[in-house]
């Protein structure tokens, strides 16, 4: 009788531990999701700040310790799944000024990094020289 209860308890614990990481990934605080961001917009006749909806967060990715010709390297990045352009007028602009058209995210997803419009290198080539690896200091 004791062994039966122990086996049942082991099965319940194993099932709970198996489901927990699955739920943690979807409820993760830093996962890929919609995020409000304030940006500064300028043009000759006016300037100001606007708040847009964009995508931000972490995506699960793997990085092999060795280069392989059989296994393609890919990195997951948080990017727009669905988006549209929205017309934005800045406060303080003279009347008759053309509006800004800003891409606004409607939904986000972790997708394979597309090298045609995203810097997918491990260390960006555009990294400012003042940023150094603390291990190299």
From Swiss-Prot:
One of its GO terms (cellular component) is extracellular space. Pfam families: Cys_knot (PF00007). Keywords: Disulfide bond, Glycoprotein, Hormone, Secreted, Signal. GO terms for molecular function: hormone activity. It comes from the Eukaryota. InterPro entries: Cystine-knot_cytokine, Glyco_hormone_CN, Gonadotropin_bsu, Gonadotropin_bsu_CS. Glycans are attached at residue 36. It is found in: Secreted. PROSITE patterns: GLYCO_HORMONE_BETA_1, GLYCO_HORMONE_BETA_2. Residues 1-24 form the signal peptide. One of its GO terms (biological process) is G protein-coupled receptor signaling pathway. Disulfide bonds join 32-78, 46-93, 55-108, 59-110, 113-120. Involved in gametogenesis and steroidogenesis. Belongs to the glycoprotein hormones subunit beta family. Heterodimer of an alpha and a beta chain. This is Gonadotropin subunit beta-1. It comes from Oncorhynchus masou.
